[in-house]
Swiss-Prot record:
Membrane topology term: Lipid-anchor
Family: Belongs to the SusD family.
Listed name of the protein: SusD-like protein BACOVA_02651
Any Pfam family: SusD_RagB
Source organism superkingdom: Bacteria
N-palmitoyl cysteine-type lipidated residues: C22
């Protein structure tokens, strides 16, 4: 088993130093200067190409499948009794393939980032500029921070790694404390803030992306295991970084929410950081999620798909009556129409009585996708951070330890998100308002669970009560929509025309779901525990080099 672990790390480290394959963005830009040999970089362009896999190959194992049940299923965005229901119902075991896929996927990001940093320090020569070296390290540290921020909110204590060779030499490593994981993330992000530029080639990270993520990290840390209050110092830092992005970046929300999820709007003005997938790309460079998300070939132009996911009862109940733009962009519901799907037929209207996934399903190859749709190959990027996320982070940081927020720029930016959805502004907001707004804004973007864990670490009793009142594992035979657009949940009577509405007509799970504090964080994959028994031991302090 130890030999296998060494081999895997070496493959990951080597892959990080290969050039990414083709696309029409920075990912396929051939370097004007090339290597002295296979591992030495002699130009800025060659070094820039070496960081390109950090935007796709590094994230592939996580994005390939695990991202959906962990990021959205765990949050109860959607449910299927046939597609990884254990994440919704909190029945995940250490043997789960998506669990191990996420663990290995995040460490692919970490070890690939480490490899880039090592290459900059030991494998550059010739005309490579100091600016190019610093930028490459900053991009690598940003991605490493993102990976660890995800891991912290899935497992809590994790293993911090800066030197791949030390891990290869001794793969039995202890877990590190959550407070040290936070500090490691912050150190990486501070470096990225200081050394990335405010503007970059499309798809490349900027200092604004680093600041936005840093704001989220400080907000998360402010209440993490802090006895039900938020640390004012961390709140102030969260406000400062979020405010800087909101007020000074010059970026703005996309006008139309639905446009965020169309292929030709990849790397739009609202996209601060995203996984950059190659349309029609090879394995490890492509977004495989299309077939897992799309419910029928009628919305993929005949491309094979197999999703049985539907929006959960609880998720669909979060949408206000007027919030049809975001609901329709996220889920198909009866009567919802899409002009950009089945274009040659005049558009597509969903006529069913379920709630299949819409977000992540851009249509078929003959729609407005330039032919770049095929089985397990979507042309869409995967968002890591959108500007709307920073807006809501700013609002929550401004709310801080108060029960309500009734004025100021935090409320203004909260309402900017609602204005885009064409729903009424709020004159004051609470944490409950922020929780609901986040859920509908980022539904099926594989991020809601991570925010829920942050709130759980801040207010555990509140969030346990929330989780246990989400109708987890429940489903309905039919969802209908009345003339006002309101959804009704239930089933049709035996006559086929009388609709029976209400919880008594829901289909309940076969077992009682009672979520407790020890259920929130996922187990470490059993295969890794066998390789590294220290995963069963208490975490230890990390020795920082900076």
């Amino acid at each position: 088993m130890r030999i296998f672990m060494k081999s895997k790390l070496l493959v990951i480290a080597t892959t990080a130093l290969l050039f990414a394959a083709c696309s029409d963005s920075f990912l396929d830009r051939a370097p004007e200067g090339n290597y002295v040999d296979a591992t030495f970089y002699t130009s800025d362009e060659a070094l820039e190409a070496a960081t390109a896999p950090l935007y796709n190959r590094a994230w592939f194992d996580y994005n390939q499948r695990s991202i959906v049940p962990i990021g959205s299923g765990r949050a109860n965005d959607m449910y299927s009794p046939w597609n990884y229901p254990q994440f919704v119902t909190f029945q995940v075991t250490a043997l789960d393939e998506n669990l191990s896929g996420a663990w290995s996927g995040f460490y692919s990001v970490v070890t690939m980032a480490n490899s880039v940093i090592n290459a900059v320090e030991t494998q550059t020569q010739g005309s490579v500029s100091e600016a190019a070296k610093t930028k490459a390290i900053a991009e690598a540290r940003l991605m490493r921070a993102c990976a660890y921020f995800y891991m912290l909110r899935i497992w809590g204590p994790v293993i911090l790694i800066e030197d791949n060779q030390k891990l290869v030499d001794n793969p039995v490593r202890p877990l590190n404390r959550e407070e040290d994981v936070f500090q490691f993330i912050i150190n990486d992000l501070n470096y990225a803030v200081d050394n990335l530029s405010e503007q970059s080639d499309k798809g490349r990270a900027t200092s604004w992306a680093a600041k936005g993520i840093l704001a989220k990290v400080y907000l998360a840390r402010s209440g993490w295991n802090n006895g039900g209050t938020r640390d004012e110092g961390d709140l102030e830092l969260a406000r400062q970084y979020a405010s800087d992005v909101c007020e000074n970046s010059g970026l703005d929300l996309m006008t139309n929410y639905e446009d965020l999820f169309k292929y030709k709007n990849n790397n739009n003005q609202e996209s601060l950081l995203a996984m950059q997938w190659v349309p029609l790309g090879e394995w490890y460079e492509c977004n495989t999620l299309l077939s897992d998300l799309a419910f029928s070939t009628e919305v993929t132009g005949g491309v094979n798909c197999w999703s049985s996911y539907n929006g959960s009862i609880d998720m669909l109940q979060q949408y206000e009556l007027a919030d049809t733009l975001r609901r329709n962009a996220t889920f198909f519901t009866k009567g919802s129409y899409y002009s950009y799907i089945c274009i040659k037929d005049g558009g597509y209207t969903y006529k069913g009585t379920a709630s299949p996934i819409k977000k992540g399903v851009p249509g078929g190859p003959d729609d407005d996708n330039d032919g770049k749709v095929k089985q397990m190959n979507s042309p869409l990027n995967t968002y890591i951070l959108r500007l709307a996320d920073v807006y809501l982070t700013y609002a929550e940081a401004c709310l801080g330890n108060n029960s309500t927020l009734s004025d100021g720029r935090g409320l203004y930016f909260f309402n900017r998100v609602r204005e885009r959805a064409k729903i009424n502004k709020k004159s004051s907001i609470t944490l409950d308002d922020i929780i609901r707004e986040r859920r509908v804004e980022f539904g099926m973007e594989y991020s809601n669970w991570y925010d829920m864990v942050t709130w759980f670490r801040y207010l555990p009793d509140k969030m346990l009560n929330y989780f246990n009142n989400q109708w987890r594992g429940y489903r309905t035979d039919a969802i209908i929509k009345d003339e006002d657009g309101k959804l009704h949940f239930g089933k049709y009577d035996t006559d086929g025309t009388t609709f029976l509405e209400g919880p008594e007509y829901y289909t309940a799970p076969e077992f009682t779901i009672n979520i407790e504090a020890e259920d929130i964080f996922l187990p470490y994959p059993e295969s890794d525990v066998i390789q590294n028994p220290l995963l069963n031991e208490p975490p230890v302090p990390y020795t920082f080099n900076e």
